[in-house]
Amino acid sequence: MSRYLRPPNTSLFVRNVADDTRSEDLRREFGRYGPIVDVYVPLDFYTRRPRGFAYVQFEDVRDAEDALHNLDRKWICGRQIEIQFAQGDRKTPNQMKAKEGRNVYSSSRYDDYDRYRRSRSRSYERRRSRSRSFDYNYRRSYSPRNSRPTGRPRRSRSHSDNDRFKHRNRSFSRSKSNSRSRSKSQPKKEMKAKSRSRSASHTKTRGTSKTDSKTHYKSGSRYEKESRKKEPPRSKSQSRSQSRSRSKSRSRSWTSPKSSGH
């Protein structure tokens, strides 16, 4: 009894057959182990090229077993073939055509779906990259840096520096608004106190001006006295002549209105 299970038929299924392998080549190799009924190499219905496998049918099952035992994993026509017993009867050309059509339809449908999926993913990636580039360009064109007048190149600030700058501006504006509100909300008492302090300072300045004028007058009188002291002493004749001239001028002034009355 053979170590292989006896199949219902005497056909061997041969895989990994070379494309240029002919039925005569397989018949020559397998015919060494017994008489062969048929050798069938299926061809593609549309391309008319070998499909990569073949069927070899023996007359006796024992010859098929010997061929399987000796030729499995052997090199034939440049390929390492694999052999096992075929399951079921040999299919007719019409059955093979229908099977090929189903496989072609399913494969083409799968390929179409795969292409559609890939194209959608690529288009989505393109849209995403375009939207990113648009957002980047929009931010660059409408950023406050570009609104400044062109001149010397400024050093680019980082995000943290910009945040600090904004925070400083906000705090400065808040302090301004608080100072304005405080100045507006000052009570009337403070205004009165300010006016009183101003009047007091004004009176002080007046007092100081009076004292300055007095001191100036005193200093002037002292200066006159000192200048008189420094003058040389006059002679008696000069003083007498001056007194006489003064008395004459006085008498003339008194006589002038009387003469006008006459």
UniProtKB/Swiss-Prot annotation:
Entry's family note: Belongs to the splicing factor SR family.
Subunit structure: The phosphorylated but not the dephosphorylated form interacts with TRA2B/SFRS10. The dephosphorylated form interacts with SNRNP70. Isoform 1 interacts with FUS C-terminus. Isoform 3 interacts with FUS C-terminus. Interacts with YTHDC1, leading to inhibit RNA-binding activity of SRSF10.
Coiled coil: none
Biased composition, class Basic and acidic residues, residue ranges: 116-126, 209-234
Principal location class: nucleus
Basic residues composition-biased segments: 165-186, 194-207
Domain RRM: start-end pairs: 10-88
InterPro entries in the record: Nucleotide-bd_a/b_plait_sf (IPR012677), RBD_domain_sf (IPR035979), RBM (IPR050441), RRM_dom (IPR000504)
Residues modified to Phosphoserine: 23, 106, 108, 129, 131, 133, 158, 160
Name assigned to this protein: Serine/arginine-rich splicing factor 10
SUPFAM superfamilies hit by this protein: RNA-binding domain, RBD
Chain spans, region Disordered: 116-262
Protein's organism: Homo sapiens
Gene Ontology molecular-function annotations: RNA binding; RS domain binding; unfolded protein binding
Expression (tissue specificity): Widely expressed.
Keywords: Cytoplasm, mRNA processing, mRNA splicing, Nucleus, Phosphoprotein, RNA-binding
PROSITE patterns for this protein: RRM
Subcellular location per the Swiss-Prot or TrEMBL entry: Nucleus speckle; Cytoplasm
Compositional bias per record (Low complexity), positions renumbered to this chain: 134-150, 252-262
Post-translational modification: Phosphorylated. Fully dephosphorylated in mitosis and partially dephosphorylated on heat shock.
GO cellular component terms, A-Z: axon terminus; cytoplasm; cytosol; dendrite; neuronal cell body; nuclear speck; nucleoplasm; nucleus
PANTHER family from the UniProt entry: TRANSFORMER-2 SEX-DETERMINING PROTEIN-RELATED (PTHR48034)
Lineage, broadest ranks: Eukaryota, Metazoa, Chordata, Craniata, Vertebrata
The UniProt record lists the keyword Ribonucleoprotein: no
Function: Splicing factor that in its dephosphorylated form acts as a general repressor of pre-mRNA splicing. Seems to interfere with the U1 snRNP 5'-splice recognition of SNRNP70. Required for splicing repression in M-phase cells and after heat shock. Also acts as a splicing factor that specifically promotes exon skipping during alternative splicing.
A GO biological process held by the record: negative regulation of mRNA splicing, via spliceosome
Gene from which this protein is expressed: SRSF10
Pfam families: RRM_1
